[in-house]
């Protein structure tokens, strides 16, 4: 039975030149797990928000949306609140109370549920989601993964019939993201709750999805099973092909025959079968020789930092050197201290012990404001922290008065068509690109990036990687904190692991990711039974072809 039926939905924002949604028609059946994907700005979030009246954007709309056969605008607010659960990308946008236990109960209180029922459901959700150990904690003390799990538990306490999730793992580390998606799979399979999710990082979702919907420029262009969608994207040489799980990409790049693998396990089996009769003679790629870098652009020596006098230390004797002209990527769990390191380097927080030197000079010894004049800039995790103007054009003008330079950077970040838009009307990926443009306009020598690929589609991510390479080749130094392990493996000069307030290991991507079990890529986990240090889909395909040629 259809839970949602959308008929000819078109929508445009006020004063917008083009429609954001154009004649979208689809059905979502009860109990389905559906993945919605597409490039940033293609209309995914706008479509999802139309499925809950209280979140529907303002603008011009035509078409019809039915929920359980009833027009959505005729379904009362209480029914929508309980039956349609919605999880946003940023966990902080949805949390409204200060205690975990109160957040779990808040939605039920607003629905007028009895105290006894609230107690039962809160207890049940705490057990199901493993929240008991932090049930009494302040929400402010939770990691990003815990906050997002709390959001999901709070919504599930209201026993929704469908869960709508808009890039829910965008701010989670790989392990927290995997745990979150496994919980979502359990909810769908064991409770029968319908799931509609949009996610750029589709590695863990493709194998469990019943259907995949693909949007382009506001239109629904594909609606099929995961394997059929993968074949279609490959046949069309679609820019969305890099979105596919690594085992599928390796399979198609190797001209594999038979059924494409969806999971690491299936990919490992396929690869093992390929080499069953021939032992590979070339098992590893040369460890990429490091570029010749200059003197350290950033040197951190024995730095200790805490946010409050009585609070625990966040940075614990941190030592770190970043050579000039290097792309230095830092990975690690939520709450390990990665973002705190960037904030401490740029002076937003102060260490109480140790030294931080930027280009050989302690940051405290730079004259007021000089550190940020063509020297150091930072892209924060939340791009909206940089927005203070009424449109994108004014945001860029604030950073650099030269119109030619503004247009050059706008073209580089692919935001020329957004110049007259309000920054808060943009999608998450578009906001990220605008914030990046603002930062690049300061022409820094040392660029700090906190989750720069969050919300970016695979196409722009590839172009962004080329931009970073060009900038580092020209001498800029980039320090990047990221949960995007694949992006780091493909593009970093040096990768480092952050744990418990310190850097505990670093090396070239093939050295670093080739030896990890969890903080590594799906390509590496899939191929390590055959190859030694292949960390990207391209690495696996290259070794495959070198040993077997083009034939699968």
Where are these regions (language model features)?
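Conserved beta-strand-loop-alpha-helix hinge in the C-terminal portion
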Residues: 215, 219-251, 502-526
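Conserved ABC ATPase "signature" region
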Residues: 116-134, 403-418
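ABC ATPase nucleotide-binding domains
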Residues: 235-296, 519-552
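Conserved ABC ATPase signature
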Residues: 138-142, 422-426, 430
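Conserved ABC transporter NBD signature motif
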Residues: 60-70, 354-362, 372
């Amino acid at each position: 039975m259809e839970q949602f039926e959308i008929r000819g939905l078109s929508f445009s924002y006020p004063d917008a030149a083009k429609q954001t949604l154009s004649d979208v028609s689809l059905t979502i059946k009860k109990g389905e797990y559906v993945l919605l994907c597409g490039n940033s700005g293609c209309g995914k979030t706008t479509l999802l928000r139309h499925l809950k009246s209280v979140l529907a954007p303002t603008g011009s709309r035509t078409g019809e949306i039915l929920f359980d056969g009833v027009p959505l605008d005729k379904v009362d607010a209480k029914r929508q609140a309980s039956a349609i659960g919605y999880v946003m990308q940023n966990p902080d946008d949805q949390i409204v109370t200060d205690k975990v236990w109160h957040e779990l109960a808040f939605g039920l209180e607003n629905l007028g549920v009895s105290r006894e029922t609230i107690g039962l459901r809160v207890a049940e959700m705490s057990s199901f989601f493993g929240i008991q150990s932090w049930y009494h904690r302040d929400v402010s003390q939770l990691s990003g993964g815990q906050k997002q799990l709390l959001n999901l538990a709070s919504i599930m306490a209201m026993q929704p019939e469908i869960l709508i999730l808009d890039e829910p793992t965008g701010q989670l580390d790989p392990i927290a993201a995997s745990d979150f998606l496994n919980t979502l799979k359990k909810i769908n399979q064991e409770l029968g709750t319908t799931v509609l999710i949009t996610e750029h990082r589709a590695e863990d979702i493709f194998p469990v999805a019943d259907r995949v919907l693909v949007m382009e420029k506001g239109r629904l262009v594909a609606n099929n099973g995961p394997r059929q969608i993968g074949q279609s994207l490959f046949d069309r040489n679609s820019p969305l092909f890099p979105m596919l799980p690594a085992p599928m990409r390796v399979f198609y790049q190797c001209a594999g025959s038979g059924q494409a693998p969806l999971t690491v396990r299936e990919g490992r089996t396929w690869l093992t079968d390929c080499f069953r009769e021939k032992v590979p003679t070339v098992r590893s790629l040369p460890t990429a020789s490091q570029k010749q870098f200059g003197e350290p652009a950033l040197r951190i020596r024995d730095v200790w930092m805490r946010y409050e006098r009585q609070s625990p230390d966040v940075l614990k004797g941190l030592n770190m050197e970043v050579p000039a002209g290097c792309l230095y990527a830092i990975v690690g769990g939520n709450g390990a201290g990665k973002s705190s390191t960037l904030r401490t380097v740029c002076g937003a927080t102060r260490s109480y012990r140790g030294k931080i030197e930027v280009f050989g000079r302690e940051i405290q010894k730079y004259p007021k404001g000089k550190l940020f004049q063509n020297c150091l800039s930072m892209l924060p995790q939340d791009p909206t922290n940089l927005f203070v103007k009424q449109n994108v054009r004014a945001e860029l003008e604030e950073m650099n008065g030269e119109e030619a330079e503004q247009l050059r950077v706008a073209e580089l970040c692919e935001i020329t068509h957004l110049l007259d838009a309000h920054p808060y009307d943009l999608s998450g990926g578009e906001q990220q690109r605008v914030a990046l443009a603002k930062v690049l306009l300061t022409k820094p020598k040392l660029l700090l990036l906190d989750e720069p690929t969050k919300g970016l589609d695979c196409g722009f991510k590839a172009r962004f990687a080329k931009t970073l390479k060009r900038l580092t080749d020209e001498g800029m130094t980039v320090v990047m904190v990221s949960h995007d392990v694949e992006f780091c493996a493909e593009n970093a000069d040096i990768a480092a692991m952050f744990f418990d307030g310190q850097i505990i290991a670093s090396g070239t991507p093939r050295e670093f990711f080739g030896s990890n079990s969890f903080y590594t890529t799906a390509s590496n986990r899939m191929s390590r039974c055959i190859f030694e240090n292949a960390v990207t889909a391209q690495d696996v395909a290259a070794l495959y072809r070198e040993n077997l040629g083009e034939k699968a």
